[in-house]
Curated annotation (Swiss-Prot):
E3 ubiquitin-protein ligase that plays several important roles in innate immunity and adaptive immunity. Mediates ubiquitination of CD86 and MHC class II proteins, such as HLA-DR alpha and beta, and promotes their subsequent endocytosis and sorting to lysosomes via multivesicular bodies. Possesses a very broad antiviral activity by specifically inactivating different viral fusion proteins. Targets and ubiquitinates cytoplasmic lysine residues of viral envelope glycoproteins with single transmembrane domains leading to their lysosomal degradation. The lineage of its organism: Eukaryota, Metazoa, Chordata, Craniata, Vertebrata. SMART domains: RINGv (SM00744). It catalyses: S-ubiquitinyl-[E2 ubiquitin-conjugating enzyme]-L-cysteine + [acceptor protein]-L-lysine = [E2 ubiquitin-conjugating enzyme]-L-cysteine + N(6)-ubiquitinyl-[acceptor protein]-L-lysine. Its EC number is 2.3.2.27. Residues 25-36 have a biased composition (Basic and acidic residues). It is found in: Golgi apparatus membrane; Endoplasmic reticulum membrane; Cytoplasmic vesicle membrane; Lysosome membrane. Zn(2+) 2 binds at residues 93, 95, 119, 122. It comes from Mus musculus. The keyword Flavoprotein does not apply. Its main location: Golgi. One of its GO terms (biological process) is protein ubiquitination. This is E3 ubiquitin-protein ligase MARCHF8. The modification Phosphoserine is found at residue 249.
Length: 286
């Protein structure tokens, strides 16, 4: 009995191919719509977050961070800059806190301009080593134009005044000497002689006082110029330097203890890890 044979075609029909293409296209469209929806929802959330009023907790936390965490970096109390290898910070006096450190160059400039040898706050006298520059390297004092003009006028007036006083004294002394000679001849000294003698004495005393005062002023200017043209090296205060060393050692001790603790933990963990390996090796040998 013969079975009816049906011819089965292995090639898919055109309708099946078009259906598959349509399904793949619809799937691609759905995936694209989903991805677009996610991308649109993400910026909308961002815009909502940006448009929403700022919470009060964020500024408080930021303020607490900035206010609670102190700055561990030391700064100079004159220029408010940090120290480095070229210009390190020193501790020349007993001041503490933000006034504890200062640059060597800043302190030298301040000492030259103020002409003082002690701290203006704690009144501690600086430990200094000074030496003068050579004369050819001396610098002028930092003065304004009005101060220089006053000094020049003062010097000119003093020179003229001293010349007049000396000339007047010379004339009076000469006339007095002539009258003394005449008195020796006649044996009588008239009243103009005593008047001139009193004037000479008063002029001479006034001239000495005037010279003393002016020499004192010029001596102060000379000291200022001398102090300005000296090389100063300020040393650390012994008490503050010892205190800084003690604080640094106290800070480094906990770190060393932590390192030792970590080392012990590592050693214990390694020993605990090696014990099972040894037992396993013994079991294998058995």
């Amino acid at each position: 009995m013969s079975m009816p044979l049906h011819q089965i075609s292995a090639i898919p029909s055109q309708d099946a191919i078009s259906a598959r293409v349509y399904r793949s296209k619809t799937k691609d469209k759905e995936q694209n719509e989903k991805t677009l929806g996610h991308s649109m929802s993400h910026p909308s959330n961002i815009s909502k977050a940006g448009s929403s009023p700022p919470s009060t907790t964020a500024p408080v936390s930021a303020f607490s961070r900035t206010s609670v965490t102190p700055s561990n970096q030391d700064i100079c109390r004159i220029c408010h800059c940090e120290g480095d290898d070229e210009s390190p910070l020193i501790t020349p006096c007993h001041c503490t806190g933000s006034l504890h450190f200062v640059h060597q160059a800043c302190l030298q400039q301040w000492i030259k301009s103020s002409d003082t040898r002690c701290c203006e706050l704690c009144k501690y006298e600086f430990i200094m080593e000074t030496k003068l520059k050579p004369l050819r390297k001396w610098e002028k004092l930092q003065m304004t134009a009005s101060e220089r003009r006053k000094i020049m006028c003062s010097v000119t007036f003093h020179v003229i005044a001293i010349t007049c006083v000396v000339w007047s004294l010379y004339v009076l002394i000469d006339r007095t000497a002539e009258e003394i000679k005449q008195g020796q001849v006649t044996g009588i000294l008239e009243w103009p002689f005593w008047t001139k003698l009193v004037v000479v004495a008063i002029g001479f005393t006034g001239g000495l006082l005037f010279m003393y005062v002016q020499c004192k002023v010029y001596l102060q200017l000379w000291k200022r110029l001398k102090a300005y043209n000296r090389v100063i090296y300020v040393q650390n205060c012994p008490e503050t330097s010892k205190k800084n060393i003690f604080e640094k050692s106290a800070l480094t001790e906990p770190t060393l203890e932590n390192k030792e603790g970590h080392g012990m933990c590592h050693s214990t963990t390694n020993s605990s890890c090696t014990e099972p390996e040894d037992t396993g090796a013994e079991i294998i040998n058995v």
